[in-house]
Amino acid sequence: MTTELLDRILSPADLRQLDRRELKRLADELRGFVLESVSRTGGHLSSNLGTVELSLALHYVFDTPHDRIVWDVGHQSYPHKILTGRREGMAHLRQQGGISGFPKRSESEYDAFGTAHSSTSISAALGMAVASRNAGVQRQHIAVIGDGAMSAGMAFEAMNNAGVTPNINLLVVLNDNDMSISPPVGALNRYLARLMSGQFYAAAKNVGRAVLQHVPPVLELARRLEEHAKGMVTPATLFEEFGFNYVGPIDGHDLDALVPTLQNLRALPGLQFLHVVTRKGQGYKLAEADPVLYHGPGKFDPAVGIQQAKAPARKTFTQVFGQWLCDMAERDERLVGITPAMREGSGLVEFEQRFPQRYFDVGIAEQHAVTFAAGLACEGQKPVVAIYSTFLQRGYDQLVHDVALQNLDVTFALDRAGLVGADGATHAGNYDIAFLRCVPNMVVAAPSDESEARLLLSTCYEHPGPASVRYPRGAGCGAAVGEGLATVPLGKGLVRREGRRIAILGFGTLVQAALGAAGQIDATVADMRFVKPLDRELVLELAARHDALVTVEEAAIMGGAGSAVLETLAEAGVTLPVLQLGLPDAFIDHGDQAALLAGLGLDAAGIERAIRARFGALLA
């Protein structure tokens, strides 16, 4: 693959030196480079193949980094990164010490705002626009947001606020990759986009509105006629009701449409809204045919595509959950499965196929997902909310106010708890223990392996109140998983290994690492199973017959399971040395999960080192 033009682009300033006729060729080179690069490292592919032309056009037209571009979610920002001087860094994308898979302010001045969670771009760009206005700085502010992210309430909250904010420059680009434009409509839309984004049209519309303001009935008639005319070839004028000048839809892969339209919009003050239609996987037929499969692939050969992987020897926790959900739904017809746009990631594909009437993908709407579950529970249903730990943060008020306060029977299956690897700090599920254990009525369970995951899911489901089960990304230790739906006593742990002098209290999958360390120092190991209700009896019994305790968790130490143990000891008046091991008060960057844990001293060797360093005298 030749990259003659791409080789000349070290920054957007170089891009803007090109003749516009060269952009199509550059787009082909950039798309080919994205495909080759991601196939070697893994990462998000379909979305990035779909934003090549849009990225080129934005940096070609706008004066970045002076003008601000905010990429919503950000997993579609690889072309942007390549065009802004990080082409060489793509070789280590999402690897420890390498560049992030998302925009990151500390990585480049072109990353105006850090993103990874959805629907934040318009709010951030609006804040920047107001700051520029207040400082007397003339610049453009662009929020690029996908059709999925646009469905979330936060995006509409931002547009509502923008509509009453005077004297700002804000362009929202809706990257719509869930529809297509037929050639005839596309040609007409391209013409209309140029017309509606032009200064004459904008000026004429504003003058006409000012004149007709004195004749309200005529103004209303003119407004309706304009909406009717545009409605023949464009979506409803919802966005104009927020005060935006709506333009589009136009083909997001047609640079001859994108560039002049953006140039026109750049010259217009105020609120502008450009609707572009793109195709996920554009230019790579395999990804076009199955954009979900190629959404976030690992390494693969582009010539043959992603091959069917051999069944792994060990099940992932997501698979264990998915099978449990189907089995429990077979037994209990009250069970309802809910996910906020994470069907594949949370393991609900089979559940949707088998129980379509009881499956609800509510879209990127975590707040709604939680309160929707609360409403179901009020009427005797048994909702299970399958959600990533990091995304539950977005529904926290609803969890407290709508579920826990009313003690409603809702089960939360928290996937990606702890470190998540390549996605990094933005997706890490490090905080759920701390923010859940302080909520009255809430149960917090942390299984140590696949078998325990099934047991604790059943236990929490049968509990008549709010409950959560947290489990990590990836495979477990290979524990055999039964087919039954047995439960265990709520709030009771068990001793997995008897030792001397030191007892390790493990919460979650780090119990396995604790067992490895204990074998070297002859320590007792308890699988605590529950952070809340904590097995107070077991904690005090272990404290009574050991000289020191160690708590281990893949979660934030501050406010975590170790804190619960310390609170129990203090309440009982027990004075005993306690070593807390877990995630530090810091955001952990991206990298391999196992390597990150080892670097934090949370593998077997690291746990042993920490215990020897703190309690060496007890081991002599």
Curated annotation (Swiss-Prot):
The keyword Magnesium applies. SMART domains: Transket_pyr. Thiamine diphosphate binds at H75, A116, H117, S118, G148, A149, N177, Y284, E366. PROSITE patterns: TRANSKETOLASE_1, TRANSKETOLASE_2. It comes from the Bacteria. Catalyzes the acyloin condensation reaction between C atoms 2 and 3 of pyruvate and glyceraldehyde 3-phosphate to yield 1-deoxy-D-xylulose-5-phosphate (DXP). Belongs to the transketolase family. DXPS subfamily. HAMAP family: DXP_synth. Homodimer. This is 1-deoxy-D-xylulose-5-phosphate synthase. It comes from Bordetella parapertussis (strain 12822 / ATCC BAA-587 / NCTC 13253).
